[in-house]
Amino acid sequence: MGQIINGKEVALKIKEEIKTFVEERKNNKLRIPKIASILVGNDGGSIYYMSSQEKVANSLGVDFLKIILEENVTDDDVINEIHKLNDDVNVQGIMLQLPLPKHLNEKKIIKEISVKKDIDCLTFESQGKLYMGEKGFLPCTPNSVVTLIKSLNVDITGKEVVVLGRSNIVGKPVAQLLLNENATVTICHSKTKNLKEVCSKADILVVAIGKPKFIDEEYIKENAIVIDVGTSSFEGKITGDVNFDKVIDKASFLTPVPGGVGALTTTLLIKNSCEALKEYED
């Protein structure tokens, strides 16, 4: 039986560092980090993620501002909120919950986030820095994936890694981060032929497709490391893309949902807000 990768445990050390940073600033009567998180509509995964952000931020002493907009808002409505946050010196990080409702122009809206406050690496400029290897905020979910793999003391160099999903939020950036670790990376998507065959060759399988319990044991190589990035609402519960019960006996390591990638992602987001505050003051 495989072992569970506990994202909460991996996050603990980082949380202690954040706590110390915030407490020192409070003791010296200095500004503390503040995150503004924007949610448009009622996507189940986004609501869950925002709630997690707020809970962790509060526990670490970081200010958290929720901005919840109706699903029928316009592009300009969302952009106006972003502009207000760009101009607010008390806000160090802006988090836009994705996906947005389909009638909104996601690229147009993301473009308006200040790169200095883009703590989840959503803007074109931030992503350009990622792909060119320049200093900038790392995208939190992809960074969480790589951090969890590294926590296993596994040498990623030369490993066959399959990333299932090609979104700009997870698939593409996590592939880039793994390339930076010298992995041999294959990206699969809805048009990939022989999907089971490709996935079953992976030493490390990263799944981010938004299909609850889609991946079963037939997609898994014996003793593979499986990282489940999915968070979907399924039968009233938050569920991953991997059928946990069917895969745990075949994988060597597997992240649970919840308690895996998401548990660390939120902590890394808050860490980025602390870094943004340092950059602002330098």
Swiss-Prot record:
Q: Would you name any one GO CC term?
A: cytosol
Per the record, what are the reactions this protein catalyses?
A: (6R)-5,10-methylene-5,6,7,8-tetrahydrofolate + NADP(+) = (6R)-5,10-methenyltetrahydrofolate + NADPH; (6R)-5,10-methenyltetrahydrofolate + H2O = (6R)-10-formyltetrahydrofolate + H(+)
Which annotated residues bind NADP(+)? 165-167, 190, 231
Tell me the SUPFAM superfamilies matching this sequence. Answer: Aminoacid dehydrogenase-like, N-terminal domain, NAD(P)-binding Rossmann-fold domains
- Gene Ontology MF, one: methylenetetrahydrofolate dehydrogenase (NADP+) activity
Identify the keywords attached in UniProt to this record, alphabetized.
Amino-acid biosynthesis, Histidine biosynthesis, Hydrolase, Methionine biosynthesis, Multifunctional enzyme, NADP, One-carbon metabolism, Oxidoreductase, Purine biosynthesis
Q: Does the keyword Hydrolase apply?
A: yes
* Pathway(s) annotated for this protein in UniProt: One-carbon metabolism; tetrahydrofolate interconversion
Report the superkingdom from the record: Bacteria
Q: Which Gene3D superfamilies match?
A: Leucine Dehydrogenase, chain A, domain 1 (3.40.50.10860), NAD(P)-binding Rossmann-like Domain (3.40.50.720)
Gene Ontology annotations of biological process type: L-histidine biosynthetic process; methionine biosynthetic process; purine nucleotide biosynthetic process; tetrahydrofolate interconversion
Q: Which Pfam families match?
A: THF_DHG_CYH, THF_DHG_CYH_C
The EC designation for this entry is 1.5.1.5, 3.5.4.9
Its biological purpose is as follows:
Catalyzes the oxidation of 5,10-methylenetetrahydrofolate to 5,10-methenyltetrahydrofolate and then the hydrolysis of 5,10-methenyltetrahydrofolate to 10-formyltetrahydrofolate.
Protein family: Belongs to the tetrahydrofolate dehydrogenase/cyclohydrolase family.
Q: Which proteins does it associate with, and in what oligomeric form?
A: Homodimer.
Q: What is this protein called?
A: Bifunctional protein FolD
What organism is the protein native to? Clostridium botulinum (strain Alaska E43 / Type E3)
The organism that produces this protein has a lineage beginning with: Bacteria, Bacillati, Bacillota, Clostridia, Eubacteriales
Which gene codes for it?
Answer: folD
